[in-house]
Amino acid sequence: MRIADYSVTKAILDRYGFTFKKSFGQNFLTDTNILQKIVDTAEIDKSVNVIEIGPGIGALTEFLAERAAEVMAFEIDERLVPILADTLRDFDNVQVVNQDILKADLQTQLKQFSNPDLPIKVVANLPYYITTPILMHLIESKIPFQEFVVMMQREVADRISAEPNTKAYGSLSIAVQYYMTAKIAFVVPRTVFVPAPNVDSAILKMTRRDQPLIEVQDEDFFFRVSRVGFVHRRKTLWNNLVSHFGKAEDTKARLEQGLALAGIKPSIRGEALSIQDFGRLADALKQVGL
């Protein structure tokens, strides 16, 4: 019997009198086939260490520990720490860290792996309410995570993996795809969780690029310009740029100059621009003094 078997999950929750906290976005997966698919998708073996975020009662952790060299699981809810010590007692390659992943000193923490030189993959069922901050925090850290295989709300997975000229495409797509390739591996129905969430989930597989997708003069400015392009999706790029940078005649002249330099029509909408287009635009706007 697996931790994720519904009867086992229920027995564990009953034994500890555990009640779900909505503020932590707790939804425990009770389908062993899906857990098997997750570790298969992540291609976990003894040559990699794994970071897990939000292990819950250890359903996914159990599968990861069987395959990985070591697992470091970050759990914010201190009530789950003794439960995890119980459910994972047969494994000597799991460390449970009772800490918010966003506040953890990851550089120091990762040195606690027996072999910290092994590649690190992030495999997790992320809390819906904080998926994007966690992902961006990890992606933008200087830690070379090799791969992410993470479950999240289907809508967020669609946005991250979206292509230009689609409804889901936006600044989040650009922010992630600048660093990573991103592809939905499979969809997970809401019915396989306790308690069931209101929406379906998806497993997103993201692999770090050797180099960012494009080279830009100023990364922060590039991300800023890409966000500006989507502030009002139905407005033209020109209107969004003017709203952000200002309506002074000198500013508008510089914007016109930058757009011309980048070879981009002012009348286009942000969703029609590729990451490469936004890169050219950001560099051009920088060049004209914005």
From Swiss-Prot:
Enzyme Commission number(s): 2.1.1.182
Keywords of this entry: Cytoplasm, Methyltransferase, RNA-binding, rRNA processing, S-adenosyl-L-methionine, Transferase
Disulphide-bonded residues: none
Any one annotated GO CC term: cytosol
Catalysed transformations (reactions): adenosine(1518)/adenosine(1519) in 16S rRNA + 4 S-adenosyl-L-methionine = N(6)-dimethyladenosine(1518)/N(6)-dimethyladenosine(1519) in 16S rRNA + 4 S-adenosyl-L-homocysteine + 4 H(+)
Binding site for S-adenosyl-L-methionine: 27, 29, 54, 75, 100, 125
Location relative to the cell: Cytoplasm
Flavoprotein in keyword set: no
GO molecular function: 16S rRNA (adenine(1518)-N(6)/adenine(1519)-N(6))-dimethyltransferase activity; RNA binding
Top-level taxon: Bacteria
Function: Specifically dimethylates two adjacent adenosines (A1518 and A1519) in the loop of a conserved hairpin near the 3'-end of 16S rRNA in the 30S particle. May play a critical role in biogenesis of 30S subunits.
Similarity-based family: Belongs to the class I-like SAM-binding methyltransferase superfamily. rRNA adenine N(6)-methyltransferase family. RsmA subfamily.
Record's protein name: Ribosomal RNA small subunit methyltransferase A
Native organism: Streptococcus equi subsp. zooepidemicus (strain MGCS10565)
Taxonomy of the source species: Bacteria, Bacillati, Bacillota, Bacilli, Lactobacillales
